[in-house]
Amino acid sequence: IKKITEERINMSGHSKFANIKHKKEKNDAAKGKMFTIIGKEIAVAVKEGGADPNNNSKLRDVIAKAKANNMPNDTIERGIKKAAGNASAINYETVRYEGYGPNGIAIIVDALTDNRNRTAANVRNCFTKGGGNVGTQGCVAYMFDEKGQIIIDKEECDMDPDELMMTAIDAGAEDFQDEEDSYEVITDPNEFSVVREALEAAGVAMAQAEVTMIPQNYVELTDDEAIKKMNIIIDRLDEDEDVQQVYHNWDESVSYTHLRAHETPEHL
């Protein structure tokens, strides 16, 4: 087990929790958007599996995600009740778009929409504005692995690291990594709920817990114009109401360091 922790290659070359915190800060600036995203996921989960979390693992996972994003319990409960009383009217469908950003950066966009044509046009426009383009299904998905990912903030975790690792591994986790600011647990998508619930039962607070697409390799951008264009694509996609999640293989930490190195003193 120790060998897993010590020898696992950090796929991004930097702390993933730093990336998570960066995303969370952006979401905090637009908390309404995040709550809308989670609200849709609650509605779909209730429609597919019912309103009782005890009998609906997908709903349990969404509730855990909601709590990790500081959604109030009463808001979660209202969302479940609303979805349960209006299940027949819920007509969201999951749509995935794949494409390329500047310098061939791979991008995957997951959306929940009640109008495919509207969403497709909006997503295509987001790519175009940043100099990218939407590709065909499967054009970049092979560059990612679908995994359950659980991030635990060290400041919020009192459990001994070895005990935490054993709890995760015994529950079925594939991998455990001790990062600078956090612990990262990786699972097979089918084992995600079991591992998350085992950690939850052990009293572990999770900063993030979701099934995600993890890049097999990351790509650096050091050209200022390419960095700006990539940010345009991501920001516009984040602002779209139908977009649930954006995945990419851009190593943002290197690009941020590059931009900071080229800023003049008055910009700092």
Regions found by a protein language model. Name each.
Residues 161-256:
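Positively charged, low-complexity, intrinsically disordered RNA-binding extensions
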Residues 133-180:
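Extended, positively charged loop/linker patches that create polyanion-binding surfaces
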Residues 113-116, 156-158, 188-193:
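Helix N-cap motif at beta-to-alpha junctions
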Residues 1-10:
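Short, Lys/Arg-enriched N-terminal segments with co-localized hydrophobic residues
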Residues 257-266:
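Conserved small/polar residues in nucleotide/adenosyl-binding loops
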Residues 11-106, 110-126, 131-135, 140, ...:
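N-terminal cationic and glycine-rich segments that engage phosphates or anionic surfaces
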